[in-house]
Structure formats: C-alpha cells, structure tokens
Amino acid sequence: MTQAEIVKCLREEYEIEHNKDQKPEKEDLPAITKKFYQRVLELLTIHKVPYSKQEDEETYEEYLLSDTEESGNKKKKQQGKLKNQDSDDEDVEARIASIKNKLRQKKGPTTERQQKRRESKKLKRSKGVQKLLLSSAKNLKNENVKHQKLKNGVVKSEQETEDSKEQIQPVKVQPVYNQEAKIVYSKVDFAANPGGKAKKSHQNPKEILKKLRDTKKHLTELREQGETDKAAEIQTDIAWRNAFDKVEGKKVKDDTKLLQKAIKKRRVEKKKSKTKWTERKQKVEHDKEKRQKKRQENLEKRSKDKKNRKLKTASKRGRIIPGY
C-alpha cells in the first residue's frame, strides 16, 4: 500500500466513526484527538510504515489528502521535476564517465612496447637528458681520439726504439796502462746511478763569483812564481770536476758575466721587496692610528651625550644650571 492509500483509509474510518454533519462539542475535542492519534499509531504499526528521513513541511503534507486539486497537481509536478533533475544528473555523470574512458583509451598505450616508446620520447624531449646525452657523446669522442693518439704514439715509440737499438753499438773499453805497464782502473763510475736525482749546485751567485775570482787569482800567482805545471794541473782538475757535475745533472756556474747579472737581479728584487714591505708597514700603522682616532672620538661623543642628558634632566626637575 502506498502512503496516499493509507491516508485515504484513515480518512474513511474517521468519517464513519464521527459523522461529518455532527459538530463535536468543545469539551470532547481533546478526547477525540487522543483517540484519533491512537488509531493512527495502530494503523501505522499494522502496515509497518517507515519513518521519513526528511523532516520538512512537504513530507508531512504527503500523508494528508490535498484540500484542492491545484495543490495536488503542483506537488505532483514538483515531484516530477525532481525526478527529471535526478535522471538528468545521472545521464550527465554517465556521459562524463564514458568520455573519460575514451580519453584514457586514447592516451593509454595498448601494449608495453608503445608505453616504453612514449617514455623514451619524453626523456629525449627533456632538457636535462639532452644535455647528458650531448656530454656523454663528447666524452666518448674524446676518449676515442685519445685512444687513437695513444695507439699511434706507441707504434711510433716502438719504431724509434727499434731504430735506436740498431744504431747503438757496444762500446769497447780499452784498458789504460801507466808508466810501470800496469792497468789503471778508473775511480769514477759514470753509470753508477744514471736514473738518480740531480744534485743541486750552490745557489748563491755572490759566493760562486768570489770562489771563481779566488781560483783565478791563485792560478795567476802560481804562473808568476813559475809553477806553470801546478797551475795547469789545477785547471785540468777543475775542468774534470765540471764535466762530472754536468754528467750528474748539476748546473755548472762558471760564467762571470751571467753570475754578475744574477747578482744584479737579486739586488733589484731585494730592493723591490724592501720597498713593498715598508709601504705595507706604513699602511698598517696608518690604519691602526685611524681606527684608534675614530674610537677615541666615539668615546668622547658618548661621554658628552651622557653629560648633556644628565644636565637636561636636572634642568627639567628644577635645578638651575648655567647654559640650560
């Protein structure tokens, strides 16, 4: 049974029990209403009518018969409109869902292969990946060029070594004999440490020049005295020593002109550094004095401001101070 039928039945029963023509007295109204409510409750419980969820005025009116046909028609129209709106909303939602599905089908790749292709294209389009690809390509190119150069260099070096080996001939050492016809063994071994580090020569050119001058003076004195053999022997010793130094990799500094040049250069550099140092010292002292002066001025200013403030406060309180 519908709600309208239930209400109709209630109305008929009410009309049967209470005649329409008879008007109830004022005293019997509360008792009649009580009985009517009890009857309605019994009917509702018998027919198992559910409670309405919406507690609006329209829902209560649905259980009652309409007084006029117009109001009933209006309600029906409103219900029809609501139903139509619901159906329209459902149709719109269904259409939106179908469009979304179509778009997904278009966008989404059908196979894994297509998906991988799209991902690779996206990666290629991105700027960061393009930069990486370019840099990697350049690195590969550089590595290939280096590899080829190394190969060419190795081949050339091998050829050069082979040529040098062919050119090198074994040195035949001939024994040296003295006056007594005995073999003299050299005390100097030239190939003792061919790959060793070169020893550093004396660095101070002033001392080297002084030493050279002293030796020259000594040689001239010997020649003047008539000891030419001794002078020649000393000269040969010096020549041999220089030769051995050159073999060991030392720098032989026996040119007086170059030594004088080096001394002059050192003197100029020393002078330059001295002037720079004095300028730096003066600048440091000047900056120091400037900072101290500024600090002193700030301290004096602060003390003056403090005094002025105190004098002002005193004058405001009523003390007579000259100048305020």
Curated annotation (Swiss-Prot):
Keywords: Nucleus, Phosphoprotein. GO terms for molecular function: DNA binding; nucleic acid binding; RNA binding. Residues 115-128, 264-275, 304-324 have a biased composition (Basic residues). Pfam families: SURF6 (PF04935). Residues 53-167, 264-324 are annotated as: Disordered. GO terms for biological process: ribosomal large subunit biogenesis; ribosomal small subunit biogenesis; ribosome biogenesis; ventral cord development. Residues 157-166, 276-303 have a biased composition (Basic and acidic residues). One of its GO terms (cellular component) is nucleolus. Its main location: nucleus. The modification Phosphoserine is found at S87. It is found in: Nucleus, Nucleolus. It comes from the Eukaryota. Belongs to the SURF6 family. Involved in a nucleolar function. This is Surfeit locus protein 6 homolog. It comes from Drosophila melanogaster. The lineage of its organism: Eukaryota, Metazoa, Ecdysozoa, Arthropoda, Hexapoda. The gene is Surf6.
